[in-house]
Amino acid sequence: MTQWWQWSGEAGAGRGGFAVIGVGRFGSSVCAELLRAGAEVLAVDNSQRAIDELRQIDPAIEARVVDCTDEEALRAAGVLDLETVVVAMSEPIEASITATLICKDAPGTRVKQVIARATSDLHMRMLQRVGADRVVFPSRMQGARLGRELVRPNLLERLRLDDSNGIEEITVPPSFVGRSLRDLNLRRHFQVTVLAAGQVNHLTFNPPASTVLGAGELLVVMGSWKALEALPAD
């Protein structure tokens, strides 16, 4: 803390949702977290074995065996119709670079954001050069954490208390801005307890009910995982 995704895309219409290219350990973790959050997910991989293993997580998941370096194959699968693509494969390096380039620059692509996995600083720079909007290192970020960030962009950090409960630090959602804690009554409406609120590096712990939340400020809340995930993300 700060001080603590058979595809049925509609032709001609860009869609929300996520595509995950490469479903090894990292990609599968991303898919699992997205599915758990109820997100629309399309998974593709060169390997039938990888796709079969992914279906053990959720037999209903939309997953296809696709040449991930072939523009027309990715287009036919529906990957280029989704807003966010996670290029989760890292080897061979040329494959991840090619997939990233296709998603960003292919004619008619509707992809708005590509998050690519890198294995080295050089790999990172090459991915950025072909248009990756964000590059992550598996050694520094778990797939599950990336999945959570994708569906809850205002989640900054989470602390596990036990299997059922935790503490999260989030950016104040727009729907909370300008409202007091008394008005929001998060304990009643969301079953969470507010531990702290305020500006970055200037949090007020156990804030009074009169505290009015501002744009860009932070909120630290405690509750069950189910309750925390029900908080608005935007």
Could you tell me what each predicted segment is?
Residues 1-234:
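Cytosolic regulatory regions of ion transport systems
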